[in-house]
């Protein structure tokens, strides 16, 4: 839990040279990378939603229903979490866009 960076190995999507090499790698390898790969923007414009719609069309992270339990002649209300008939929210547009987690830039230095 926690890390949401990419686990793939290979070319760094934001680098101009493969593997972040020095000046010696700036020659033919750089032109090869540019011709194969397209420019990747450092921003993320959408994300997967974390909420759900229920049968009534309500949107929330979790849904509960109230059930009445009779124990020793006393009625007691309990909340039971609903897991069925929930529809994921889908793709959510981010406003403003966020910086990609793999973008190599220092935002704040002490």
From Swiss-Prot:
Lipid attachment, kind N-myristoyl glycine: 2
Coiled coil: none
GO CC terms: mitochondrion
Biological processes per GO annotation: cell maturation; defense response to Gram-negative bacterium; inflammatory response; natural killer cell differentiation; negative regulation of interleukin-17 production; neutrophil-mediated killing of gram-negative bacterium; phagocytosis; positive regulation of interleukin-10 production
This protein's UniProt keywords: Lipoprotein, Myristate, Phosphoprotein
Gene that this sequence comes from: Tusc2
Record-stated family: Belongs to the TUSC2 family.
Segments of this protein annotated with the region Disordered: 1-33
Name this protein carries in UniProt: Tumor suppressor candidate 2
Residues in the signal sequence: none
PTM info: Myristoylation is required for tumor suppressor activity.
Organism: Mus musculus
Residues bearing PTM Phosphoserine: 50
Cited InterPro entries: FUS1
């Amino acid at each position: 839990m926690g890390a949401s960076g990419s686990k793939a190995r290979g070319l760094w999507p934001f680098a101009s040279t493969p593997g972040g090499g020095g000046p010696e790698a700036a020659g033919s390898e750089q032109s090869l990378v540019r011709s194969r790969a397209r420019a990747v923007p450092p921003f993320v414009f959408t994300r997967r939603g974390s909420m759900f719609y229920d049968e009534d069309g309500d949107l929330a992270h979790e849904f509960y229903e109230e059930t009445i339990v009779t124990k020793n002649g006393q009625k007691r209300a309990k909340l039971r979490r609903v897991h069925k008939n929930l529809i994921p929210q889908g793709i959510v547009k981010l406003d403003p866009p966020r910086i990609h987690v793999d973008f190599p830039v220092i935002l704040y230095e002490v």
